[in-house]
Regions:
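Small/aliphatic-rich secondary-structure junction motif
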Residues: 2-55, 109
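Structural beta-alpha unit
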Residues: 1-3, 80-115
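Glycine-rich, Arg-bearing micro-motifs that act as flexible, cationic patches
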Residues: 114-139
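A short acidic, glycine-rich active-site loop
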Residues: 56-70
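Inter-domain helical "communication" segments and dimerization helices
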Residues: 49-59, 74-85
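Intrinsically disordered or low-complexity boundary/linker segments at protein termini
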Residues: 1-20, 82, 113, 139-149
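Short beta->alpha linker loops
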Residues: 93-97, 120, 149
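General small-molecule cofactor/ligand-binding pocket signal
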Residues: 39, 90-94, 146
Length: 149
């Protein structure tokens, strides 16, 4: 990475696959004094078991939001304990299509110049119905994109 990045977006699916990739990204951000946005996108289509015709009740959505925010705060605390600055790490939750939010909406709003994704936990059937977030982001993002395993 030769370009001095200013703000990194790490998009998480809150799976165990993300842990190493997030730790490495946070270490890079910390060493280079770069802002780190950690984003989780709650996809109602997936939360509704893949059927976009079934809408989640507002109570169910509220509970999913609260659980997700709690998990993001745990991630933030772990990074701060391991050396990141409280002013450097920011956690965010959005609801919608992860492909659009990660590739376009969020980086535009927060001016992220690097997007980091980790390898997907979706199986082939899920990827068939919902599409690959990574593939979409690579094709449509204006920022540089890194996929970590």
């Amino acid at each position: 990475m030769t370009q001095p990045y200013q703000r990194i977006l790490f998009a998480t699916d809150q799976s165990e696959n993300n842990v190493t990739a997030l730790e490495r990204t946070a270490e890079y951000a910390n060493k280079n004094n770069i802002q780190l946005d950690i984003l989780y996108v709650l996809d109602p289509a997936i939360a509704g078991f893949g059927n976009t015709q079934i809408e989640l009740s507002s109570e169910s959505l509220y509970h999913l939001e609260e659980k997700s925010i709690g998990q993001l705060e745990i991630i933030k605390r772990r990074l701060i304990i391991s050396g990141s600055s409280i002013y450097q790490v920011h956690v965010h939750l959005r609801i919608g299509d992860p492909r659009i939010i990660v590739a376009q909406e969020f980086p535009t709003e927060y001016q992220n110049d690097l997007i980091v994704l980790s390898s997907s936990r979706k199986n082939h059937l899920q990827r068939f119905f919902t599409g690959s977030v990574s593939s979409y982001v690579i094709k449509n993002a204006q920022a540089d994109v890194v996929i970590m395993h």
